Amino acid sequence: MHSPSVSSASTISAYSDDKQFTMRIKYGLYLSLFLGLSFTASAKSKGPIRVACIGNSITYGYGLADREHEAYPVLLQQKLGARYQVENFGKSGATLLARGHRPYFQQEEYKKALAFRPDIAVIHLGVNDTDPRNWPNYQDEFIPDYHHLIDTLRAVNPQVRILIARTTPIGVEHPRFESGTRDWQLQIQQAIEQVAKSADVELIDFHSPLYPHPHYFPDAVHPIAAGMHFLAETAYQAISGDFGGLQLPVIYSDGMVLQRQRPLTIRGKANAGELVTLSFHGWSGNTKTNRLGEWAITLPAQSAGGPYSLEVSTPQSKRKIKLSNVYVGEVWLCSGQSNMAFMLSQSTDKEHRPIQPDSMLRIYNMQPAQET
């Protein structure tokens, strides 16, 4: 959503409230100073690629023993290297909402982020908007306010690349978790996803990588240093396109069985934009990964048979994964709770249970992330 002028009538009319009107005019006048200087700045030689990490206390590094070395923007700088200049513009308690209890728009960090004129902006805001002073009263303004933040960044650098993040988890130990925070955060996540589409910016996920690790959140909100590595890696992968090269999920392995008589979609990861080729039993197909390094190729329905080989490769990086002894047949799923993981060897009458060997029977035992 590009704004031709930060003080345009469209910006003014979007906020009829007197307080909002005053705030927007103030931001517009402030931004016009940057726009006036942009021609001078563009004439200078290009230095490192400037990356602005915009956010709240999680970006700032609140609660870390050594935020100067452990906050995710610092780790991101280490990953990206000398070609990039990463700056931390996190503000503790900041809200995305302009009428929230501590609007990011009113903070010095916001002004500094604009003065930095980033080439890339990573935005992680929305956690503090779950406060009952904010979301219940101003939720309808969240998407317009997010658009305004994006517009102001584009105003100081029209070529800026913007990545907005789904918010980090809020733990069940949070005192307001069941009284509104849980549901409001879900609504905020959905709003962020909508902004990514309507503003044509990139969506990254700070939520999913940390969700399986509640022990990284001693106060239910702020991740410890180990959690910061997940945030830095997520941002690094999105910026660089480096997702670690060609990969297949653990469920694909030597000796596996593919379901017969049905088209099957094989999924995996590789670096962003890479060409991926898949070959199986005389058939081959290819595709390109998306910006998140994800790819999917659908095999046509196959008749029962085997053994075959399945090969996946990325010609650009010269990587190859070859799976052998692959059959096409019947696949049965045995799902359930922890009692489904009970081993026959643990049974008191195990010696009385006859076991018939079957060379054509393949069993894949998915290991739990955590024992329950």
Which stretches of residues belong to each language-model region?
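Bacterial Sec-dependent N-terminal signal peptides
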Residues: 1-3, 18-45
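Alpha-helical cap/lid subdomain in secreted, periplasmic
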Residues: 44-46, 78, 104-242
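Conserved SGNH/GDSL esterase-like catalytic core that processes O-acyl groups on lipids
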Residues: 46-53, 58-147, 183, 329-333, ...
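Proline/serine/threonine-rich low-complexity linkers at boundaries of modular beta-sandwich domains
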Residues: 243-248
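Surface-exposed, proline-enriched loop/turn segments that connect beta strands in immunoglobulin-like
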Residues: 251-253
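Short, solvent-exposed loop/linker segments at the N-terminal edge
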Residues: 256-260
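Structural beta-strand segments of beta-rich domains
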Residues: 262-266
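Extended acidic/polar, glycine-enriched regions
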Residues: 267-335, 339-343
